[in-house]
Design a protein with these regions (language model features):
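Alpha-solenoid HEAT/Armadillo repeat architecture
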Residues: 30, 70-73
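Short alpha-helical DNA-recognition segment
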Residues: 47-67
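DNA major-groove recognition helix of helix-turn-helix/homeodomain DNA-binding modules
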Residues: 77-94
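Residue at a beta-strand N-cap/secondary-structure junction
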Residues: 48, 74-77
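Long, contiguous binding/interaction regions
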Residues: 59, 96-97
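N-terminal flexible/basic segments that precede or flank functional cores
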Residues: 1-43
Length: 97
């Protein structure tokens, strides 16, 4: 197995822990790069069972979820909220410090 595949497998395994996933998503948000956050969200979604399982939880269709999590994804707030809720998280606002 290549180093990058081994790293990805370890990352996905660690993101099965909700605290690890929370820290990972927050770190991605702090980078102020929406594309990076979508990559992080894709990884957490994969760790939590993938798009098929999330489609059932979010009541969104698979195609919409795949599109939302793609490299060109631009999720609507309502869809993002539904996805985060299905993953066990919520949207929050904090003061910029």
């Amino acid at each position: 197995m290549s180093k990058s595949k081994a790293y990805h497998a370890e990352l996905i395994e660690s993101l099965r822990d909700s605290h690890e996933a929370e820290e990972y998503l927050n770190a991605a948000l702090e980078e102020d790069n929406p594309d990076l956050f979508l990559v992080a969200l894709r990884n957490v979604a994969e760790a939590q069972g993938g798009v098929a399982q999330l489609a059932d939880k979010t009541k969104l269709n698979r195609e919409s979820l795949y599109k939302m999590l793609s490299e060109r994804g631009n999720p609507e707030l309502k869809s993002l909220d539904a996805l985060l809720h299905a993953l066990g998280f919520r949207l929050a606002v904090a003061a910029n410090r």
